[in-house]
């Protein structure tokens, strides 16, 4: 039986009179990989910020792990975010910290682990992303793809139930981008993490997604598999896939 782990219910959001979300409705199933597609300014990143409580919608409800995010205070939101990992576009590593210290940072901040447990957890997550033994390296010694993978190891270090990827393959060469795509799928299969991917990379979307949700003019205009989207008779979907909508 499928379980809905995230739900956006009639969500509205505007900035300076410009409507970004015009009644967003979307349910995300536990354990799936869902990608959010849409042109620039369609509100994809705002949706993620609303999900983790960095922004509040003007109207509507966002249910995460059976809790209404829009009604939580900051203390409760901080506790809720411990269940969520995020891989940023640029990996967002601390330049002055080693790989080990970067990955250990959220463990020290949020979990009560012994030093041995932290060392084991860091080693395990680096092994999962194919980077065993680089704990002592500094970020400036790493390639772009390695930085992304270290960022991913940090994102899963606290063993979250949900992970958010923001442009995970941007700026990477095709082979490295494919390695990141493979990791997204591999981690979901091994760990059962519910996964949300925000990207303009259609190859990434096609490769990793169980389902895809497309945003246009403040609404979710289509939800389905890649095969369902490419055969959709919704014109804006076809325009986006064919490159006729600026991303």
Features from the language model and the residues they span:
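A short, proline-enriched helix->beta-strand linker immediately N-terminal to the Walker B motif
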Residues: 157-161
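Conserved ABC ATPase signature
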Residues: 138-142, 146
């Amino acid at each position: 039986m499928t379980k809905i782990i995230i739900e956006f219910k009639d969500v509205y959001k505007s900035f300076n009179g410009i409507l970004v979300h015009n009644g967003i409705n979307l349910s995300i199933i536990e354990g799936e990989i869902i990608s959010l597609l849409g042109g620039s300014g369609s509100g994809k990143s705002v949706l993620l910020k609303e999900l983790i409580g960095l922004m509040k919608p003007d109207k509507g409800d966002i249910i995460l792990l059976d809790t209404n995010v829009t009604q939580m205070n900051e203390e409760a939101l901080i506790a809720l975010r411990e269940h969520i990992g995020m891989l940023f576009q640029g990996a967002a590593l601390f330049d002055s910290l080693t790989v080990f210290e970067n990955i250990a940072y959220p463990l020290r901040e949020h979990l009560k682990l012994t030093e041995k447990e932290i060392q084991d957890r860091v080693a395990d997550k680096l092994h999962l992303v194919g980077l065993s033994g680089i704990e002592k390296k500094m970020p400036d010694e790493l390639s772009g793809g390695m930085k992304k993978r270290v960022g991913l190891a940090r994102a899963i270090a606290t063993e979250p139930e949900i992970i958010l990827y923001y442009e995970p393959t941007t700026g990477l060469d095709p082979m490295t981008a494919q390695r990141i795509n493979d990791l997204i799928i591999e981690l979901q299969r091994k760990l059962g993490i519910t996964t949300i991917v925000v990207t303009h990379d259609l190859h990434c979307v096609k490769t990793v997604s169980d389902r895809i949700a497309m945003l246009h003019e403040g609404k979710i205009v289509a939800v389905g598999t890649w095969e369902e989207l490419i055969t959709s008779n919704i014109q804006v979907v076809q325009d986006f896939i064919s490159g006729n909508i600026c991303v």
